[in-house]
């Protein structure tokens, strides 16, 4: 069985690059889905509020299978957390397919360790109850702080992908005009960044999913997205404390509370010397982890990885991100 590491470990591997500060002499770029059918987060436990429905069926699993065991006890986790929503999906026995899909993601992220998966689900539910990321997707943010920093784009024709469409999130670091304004208010930055992440997850269409997520080690999860970190016009010479703090906290939050949502992560427009460093780093991490991130020195190389259904600046055929992609609401 191949070794598959969690998104949290991938983020740890890439953290040195993501957390490098931005020079005071240059502009910086800010850090790393709304879909019909998703359900807004409930304000209180609603384990029994969803009416039984007919829908897709999950393949039968043996009583001792980790997913069977998790499904038997997840309601206890919900009661403890006093919340039952993940990615806009209500976890209930009346919604077995989508519930098992979410539980399977937590199992895969923890290599089928039920205790660890249970703990991560509990922490995620508590965090979602407090932070309310679904609400964040519809909030308005200051255009002067976050304009041009992040976009979500649906693309077709990704090489080797079996999906009709894939979801790509772009983090445009060079769009930052004022580092202190963008990153200084950490909580404000997190609401923007988590809102963007939640928006991208909604685009995965989990509420209408009909294909089961494979067991850990038995194939790829089809419900994952790509993350792009564009460092054009960004200096790696200095570390800005505010940028470093915001990046570190973002990695912590997304790595812990969004398991199995990352297919691959690309760092583009990275200076050649930094590319060499990451090439060396990939030699000392697990093979499956190394597959999840790539460093590209030039933006137009991205089309070789994701196909041509991306903006021309990345080697594709589409117009610029502002024209073809979706960002957060700004005012």
Curated annotation (Swiss-Prot):
The keyword Manganese does not apply. Non-classical phosphatidylinositol (PtdIns) transfer protein (PITP), which exhibits PtdIns-binding/transfer activity in the absence of detectable PtdCho-binding/transfer activity. Regulates PtdIns(4,5)P2 homeostasis at the plasma membrane. Heme-binding protein that may play a role in organic oxidant-induced stress responses. One of its GO terms (biological process) is regulation of exocytosis. Pfam families: CRAL_TRIO, CRAL_TRIO_N. One of its GO terms (cellular component) is cortical endoplasmic reticulum. Heme binds at residues 173, 193, 229, 231, 265. Belongs to the SFH5 family. Residues 23-37 have a biased composition (Basic and acidic residues). This is Phosphatidylinositol transfer protein SFH5. It is found in: Cytoplasm; Endoplasmic reticulum membrane; Microsome membrane. The keyword rRNA-binding does not apply. Residues 1-62 are annotated as: Disordered. Residues 46-56 have a biased composition (Polar residues). Keywords: Cytoplasm, Endoplasmic reticulum, Heme, Iron, Lipid transport, Membrane, Metal-binding, Microsome, Transport.
